[in-house]
Structures are given as structure tokens and as C-alpha cells.
Amino acid sequence: MPSALAIFTCRPNSHPFQERHVYLDEPIKIGRSVARCRPAQNNATFDCKVLSRNHALVWFDHKTGKFYLQDTKSSNGTFINSQRLSRGSEESPPCEILSGDIIQFGVDVTENTRKVTHGCIVSTIKLFLPDGMEARLRSDVIHAPLPSPVDKVAANTPSMYSQELFQLSQYLQEALHREQMLEQKLATLQRLLAITQEASDTSWQALIDEDRLLSRLEVMGNQLQACSKNQTEDSLRKELIALQEDKHNYETTAKESLRRVLQEKIEVVRKLSEVERSLSNTEDECTHLKEMNERTQEELRELANKYNGAVNEIKDLSDKLKVAEGKQEEIQQKGQAEKKELQHKIDEMEEKEQELQAKIEALQADNDFTNERLTALQEHLLSKSGGDCTFIHQFIECQKKLIVEGHLTKVVEETKLAKENQARAKESDLSDTLSPSKEKSSDDTTDAQMDEQDLNESLAKVSLLKALLEEERKAYRNQVEESSKQIQVLQAQLQRLHMDIENLREEKDNEITSTRDELLSARDEILLLHQAAEKAASERDTDIASLQEELKKVRAELERWRKAASEYEKEVTSLQSSFQLRCQQCEDQQKEEATRLQGELEKLRKEWNVLETECHSLKKENVLLSSELQRQEKELHNSQKQSLELTSDLSILQMTRKELENQMGSLKEQHLRDSADLKILLSKAENQAKDVQKEYEKTQTVLSELKLKFEMTEQEKQSITDELKQCKDNLKLLQEKGNNNKPWPWMPMLAALVAVTAIVLYVPGLARASP
């Protein structure tokens, strides 16, 4: 199964190392090289002094497909893109790393003794998945410039949708980075302080050891001197050696007690400095938390203001949207009203056109029907009469004309009321004139029928009826003449009617042409209206489309703003809740910390008072010790010089020691030889001691006598001193008198006499006291 690969590439500001290709089949340890594990190209062990042995762990999680890095309680820390994973000597949670991240192990450390700077490991990491593809880059992750620690191997990738929140996170990260740098500086200062304390302790220990060595050398020198003396008594030699050893033990115990006292004082001063530092750190943390609280409150206020601004913008946009919707509705209503008006006009024109067409069709149908009736009547009359049909034709034509005229008058009635009245008057006149002819025609038809009946019934009476027929013919001729006259009159009337009909036709034609022109103009208007309606509809459609697009845009923008507002609300609520929780936690922590700190403060105050008193005393002692230290430094300098001299003396002493050892060998032989002599001498010495004892008793008696003499001389001396004082007083009085008067020439002689008497009195006493 293929495994994931991590490549560590050295950067210019790093401690130099070869490029490492590490396969992450299992969690890989990153650390300092030791005897068991040496640096190689396939491991993460580096030859660098600032790394810990078990500095960090790196591994690949097959479930999530992500790479993780964990700091394992390293002393100098692990950094991803200049962000420390944990505080000093604390284990960090697993943190996701991406390809292209800058990984730093440890920090640069400078040695004060040799002034050498040890560099840290800074590398660019490239990560490859088991399938050979490179892992995600940091630039591909949106708004996640720095990795964040995860709990239980789950990447906590922040999802930021706002530039302000991103800047806020950047500011927080920069503040954390500055805090980490300050912590590192404090750690380095603490380390330097510890180093200086260790250096002072070592220097003090060296001073004490050197003093011990000097005292030991002095003791050895004294012992050497004691041994080099040709003493005859071993007891005196042993006693001197014991006294020197006692002196050395006393000095060592005194110096040890002094060192212990100084160490206790230094420990107290160190504890005091630690307490002061912890107090200053807690105060700094309190001020930092207060500043963070104020900053977060200001940021929340800014977010609230921005949210209110966004809400106001949303309200303005909603108002604009409502105004646009109102305008669109007005435009739609206007378009609908115009469309309805145009449609109504079109419908009216179409109805008028249909009515005119219906009227024309009705007139045409009536005309056809009347023509059919007239043709039928003509045929019937022709079949019945078979005679002169001119009158009938004229009558039919007249009837046709009358029918046409009636139809035309009907049309004129519908079009114009005035012409309708005239047409009705003319029709009434025509009906009056045609009524006798109609009656006669009806009588003729009845006579024809009667004739047919007579012809059918009585053919025999033909001859009789011929005479009657002739008479009737005469009468009929008369009637025909009368009817011809009437026809002429009717023809004249018909001509007049023709003229009127022609005029009416012309008027009708004019009206028809005018109506047709009106229809054409109406059609043109309808077309124009259709075109205008289409244009208006197209414009309205375009306006509606543009308005709909704008409406969609506005709605989309409104929806976006609403989503943004909802997201802002969610973020604000989450931030408020988290901030409230954080504030509550901070308040609880601050309360607990405050109570704890108050208790500690009270303790510290008590300790401070105690320590202050001790500090004053220690300061005084420190001044004394500093002066003593300066003196001892001077002595140390002198002792160093003396030590150099003593080293030379030691070499000489070693030479002399060798010689003395040789001499001791010879002395032992002499001692063995002299032991017998010493025994003899010892017996002699015992005898001499007895003699000395006797002499001692004698001297004791002499001493008692001398003491008595001394007391007597002391009394004499006291009396002489009193006399001398009196003489001095008298001399002063005499000098004062001499200053007032002329000096006496015998005064020096008197002073010399007094001095001589004092000497005479004082010297014998001394001579007696001296034996």
C-alpha cells in the first residue's frame, strides 16, 4: 500500500540540513540527534542543539486524508507559519498542516559564556497524498492563512465571510504572536537570570573552594612548619597539629554557615523576584484581558453598526423595490388600460364592420329575394295573360326600382334620419300612386280567372260573349288609354323617381365610398392601432422584461443582502453568544482569579511585609556583603596572586616534601636511634622537671612577693600622679601669673626640678616593679 510523503526543505534562515524525504506510514518523531538515532535523509532527526529529543510528531490520517503536526512538550516550541502551537513545555493539540507551510522547530539560542548563537530548524514542507497528488496549498484555503489547533484529530478550519472578521482574526493572531514573542523574551530573560544566578553560584562556590584551598594550604604549611621544626616532644607536635585541624574545621564550618546563609538570602531574593514577576504577569494579563474585552466590545459595536447600516440599506433597497414595483404596476395598469382602450376601439370598429357587412348581406338577400319574387310574378303573369306585357314589364321594373328604392331608403334610414323621412314620404307618395294600378291588376287577375272559368264553363256562350268582349275591349281600351295616361303620368313620376333614385344612389354611393373610406381609414387606424399596440406591447414587454430583470436583480441583491443579513445576524448572535460565554468565562475566571489573587495578594502582602523587612535587612547585609565581596574579591585577586605564588611554592614544597620524606626516613632511623637516648634524656628531663617544679614553687613565692611590691608601687605611683597633677596645676597658675606679669627667670629651673623629682620618684618604682 502506498504511503504519504513529507519533504522538508531547508530555508536560508535555518540551521543547515539536507533535504529530508519522510514516509508517513506511522507517526514520525521529530527531534535532536542522539547516539541511538543519527540524522538521515529518510528521518526527521536533526543535528541541532535547540531541539528537544522528542520535539514533535507528524503523521497522516487516512480517514480524513489530512496531515497533522503535534508539539510534544518541547522546550523551545514548534511554529507553523510563525504561529506557536503551544506554550513552553506544554503538549499542543494536533494541528492540520498544508503543503507549502513554513515549519519552525525551536528558536535561536545565544550562549552568554561563548557568545555563540545556535540556529533553529526552519523548513518548507511539501506534502504528497498516497495517490501521488500534492496536498492542498495554504493559498487554496479561503480565509485560513494560519492553521488552528484541532481536538481529536479534526481540523478546525474557520469559515469567514466578512473582511472585517478576517481583519479581526488577523489582529488577534498578531496580538497572540506578539504575546508569544513577549513570552519567549520573558523565557529568555528568565533563562539568562537563571544562568547569571548559576554563574554567581559557581563563582561564589569557586571563591569558597579557593578560600578552602588557601586555608588548607595554610594549614598544610603550618603543619609542614610544625613538622619541619626539630622538636623533641611528640606531644607538643600532636597538640599543634590538632590545634591547626581544629582551626581549619572551625573556619570551614564558619564558611559553610556563611555560604548557607548567603544561599538562603539569595533564594529569598529569587522567590521575591519570582513573586514580583508573577504579580506583574498577572497584572499584565488582567490589563491584556481588559484591553481584549474592550477591543472585542468595540468590534462588536462596529459589527452592530455595520449590521444596522446593512439593515438600513436593506430597508432602503426594499423601499426602492416597493417604489419600483409600484411604478411597474402603474406602467402595467397604464399599458393594460391603453391595451383595453385600443382593444375596445378595435372591437367597436370590428362590430361596425360586421354590422355594415351584415346590413350589406341583408340588403343583398332582400334584393335577391325580391328579384326572385318579381321574376316568378312575371312568369306567372306571362303565362296567364300572354298579351301585352310591356306594362307588366314596366310595372315589374317599377316594382324592382321601388324595391331597390325601398331597400336603399332603409339603408339611408339607418345611416341618416333626415333622408329616412324623405324616403318614407316618397314611398308614401309612390304607394298612393301605385295603389289603383295594384287594385286594377288585382281585378284583372280576378277577371282573368273568371274568364277562365267562363271559358271553361261556357264555351257555347263564346259568340255571345264576343260582343260583350268587344264592348269590354272598348272599355278596356278606354281603360288602357286612361291607364296609358296614368302610365305616362307614372312614367313622369318614375323619371322623377329615377332622378331621385340616381341622386339617392349617388348619395348612397358617396355614402358607401365614404363608409368604405371610413372603413379603410378605420382599418388603417386599426392597423396603426395594432402596430401602436404591438409597439406599446413590445415596449411594455421590453419595459416589463427590463423591469423584471431589474426586479430580479433587486430581488437577488435583496436576497443576497437578506442572506448576508441573516449570516451577519447568525455571526453576530454566535459572536454575541460566544462573547457572552467568553465574557462570562472571563468574568468567572477573573472572579476566581481575583479571589485567588486577592488571597495570594494578602499572603503576598504579608510575605511582602515580611520580605520587605527581610529585604531591608538583606539590603543592609547586601551592602555589607557587597563591600565584603569587594574586599573578598580584592583578597581573591591577591589570593590568586598568592595562589600563583603558592603554586610555585607548592612545587618547591613538593620538592622539599620529597626531601623531607627522605629526611623523615633518615629521621625515623635517627628517631629509633635517639629513642633510647630520649628515654635516658626523659629520665633526665623528669629529674629536671622535678627541679623545675621546685623552682616553679620558688618562683611562685617570689611572684607573690613581687605582686605585693607591685601593689605598693602602684599606690606610690598614684600618689605621685596626684602630686604631679597638683604641680601641673600650680605650674599653670604660675604660668598664668607669669603671662600677666613679667616672666620669672627661675621658672624653667623650677620646671626642670619638678621633672627631675618626678623621674626620681617614678623610675625606682618601675625598677622595683620590673624584677
Swiss-Prot record:
Its main location: membrane. Residues 1-163 are annotated as: Necessary for targeting to centrosomes. The chain crosses the membrane at residues 746-766. InterPro entries: Cent_Immune-Sig_Mod, FHA_dom, Prot_inh_fetuin_CS, SMAD_FHA_dom_sf. Residues 167-202, 230-381, 452-742 form a coiled coil. GO terms for cellular component: centrosome; endoplasmic reticulum membrane; extracellular space; FAR/SIN/STRIPAK complex; M band; mitochondrial membrane; sarcolemma; Z disc. Keywords: Cell membrane, Coiled coil, Cytoplasm, Cytoskeleton, Endoplasmic reticulum, Membrane, Mitochondrion, Phosphoprotein, Transmembrane, Transmembrane helix. Residues 1-745 are cytoplasmic. It is found in: Cell membrane, Sarcolemma; Cytoplasm, Myofibril, Sarcomere, M line; Cytoplasm, Myofibril, Sarcomere, Z line; Cytoplasm, Cytoskeleton, Microtubule organizing center, Centrosome. Expressed in heart (at protein level). Expressed in heart, skeletal muscle, smooth muscle, kidney, spleen, pancreas and brain. One of its GO terms (molecular function) is protein-macromolecule adaptor activity. The keyword Transmembrane applies. The modification Phosphoserine is found at S148, S431, S435. It comes from the Eukaryota. It is a single-pass type IV membrane protein. Residues 28-85 form the FHA domain. Homodimer. Interacts with myosin. Interacts with SIKE1 and both associate with the STRIPAK core complex composed of PP2A catalytic and scaffolding subunits, the striatins (PP2A regulatory subunits), the striatin-associated proteins MOB4, STRIP1 and STRIP2, PDCD10 and members of the STE20 kinases, such as STK24 and STK26. Interacts (via FHA domain) with STK3 (when phosphorylated); the interaction associates STK3 with the STRIPAK complex. Belongs to the SLMAP family. Alternative spliced transmembrane domains determine subcellular targeting. Isoforms 1, 2, 3 and 4 are targeted to endoplasmic reticulum membrane as well as mitochondrion membrane. Isoform 5 is not targeted to mitochondrion membrane but to endoplasmic reticulum membrane. This is Sarcolemmal membrane-associated protein. It comes from Oryctolagus cuniculus.
